[in-house]
Amino acid sequence: MMSKDKNRTNDVLIEAGLLSLVLTGTTLATYRGYTRYLRQIRNARGIPSKVFRKRWLYGKVTAVGDGDNFHFFHMPGGLFGGWGWLRSTPQLEKIDIVKKSRNSKRLLDFFRSSNKYVDLPVQYKNKRRLPTISVRICGVDAPERSHFGNPAQPYSEEALIWLQHEILGKKLWIKPLNIDQYGRCVASIRYWTRFGYKDLSLQMLKEGLALVYEGKSNAEFGGREKIYRRHEFIAKSKRIGMWSQKKLETPGDYKRKL
């Protein structure tokens, strides 16, 4: 009788031990799954090293401050990660879109290629003070806007408006490649259009609103430098966008003068 009770006690202990192992394993697996797939990255410095060049991050563009950078609110897992029903997503304030009237000067300039960019509708206002990743679009350089009293480059406003029109308030994918000297995440960008997914860097080059990045430090192309240079050449030969100017000062030359 004692032997049977002892065996039963041993069986209970073994079962309890196995259950404990299963629960521990499940907890560890759940934690690893959460940290790998569902934990939000709240700034560029918080991106794990294992993510660079290997993983795409999904999220929403909450602000566009220049022609080649923006703020990205990471939404890991998307709908399945609870965003929009368990976890709140930032809502951007809408802008009342009013058709822009052309004054006499604009009428004289009607055929300037920049008009098609200036007149693009921007639906949302930037939303700041959020836990976002500051993103620098890889492989390209857009014309410089006015900084510290210095004049803006031609087509800098057009590049900004086009970028706001394309991605502000929208969801897209980024692949982190590096962190630049300003603490921004240099990344490849893919965003959805009615024609399918597009490479944001490539689209800017096709529109003539950026040129291939000239800097020697932190030059990142996501493996697409040849494609970028080919489409820069096409835009230049067709005098599209910024290439329509008689004399073009590159963003790199502009910055070297400051």
Swiss-Prot record:
Enzyme Commission designation: 3.1.-.-
> GO molecular function terms here?
endonuclease activity; metal ion binding
Residue ranges of domain TNase-like in the record:
55-245
- From which source organism is this entry? Nakaseomyces delphensis (Yeast)
Which Pfam families does its entry note?
A: SNase
Keyword list, A-Z: Calcium, Endonuclease, Hydrolase, Membrane, Metal-binding, Mitochondrion, Nuclease, Transmembrane, Transmembrane helix
Q: How does it sit in the membrane?
A: Single-pass membrane protein
Major site of localization recorded for this protein: mitochondrion
Gene Ontology cellular component?
A: membrane; mitochondrion
The text of the family note is:
Belongs to the LCL3 family.
Against PANTHER family, the record matches this protein to:
EBNA2 BINDING PROTEIN P100, SERINE_THREONINE-PROTEIN KINASE 31
Q: Membrane spanning segments where?
A: 12-34
Where does the source fall among the domains of life? Answer: Eukaryota
The UniProt annotation places Ca(2+) binding at 141
Q: Does the keyword Metal-binding apply?
A: yes
State what protein this is by name.
Answer: Probable endonuclease LCL3
Query: What does the UniProt entry say about where the protein is found?
Result: Mitochondrion; Membrane
Spell out the catalytic residues: 136, 144, 184
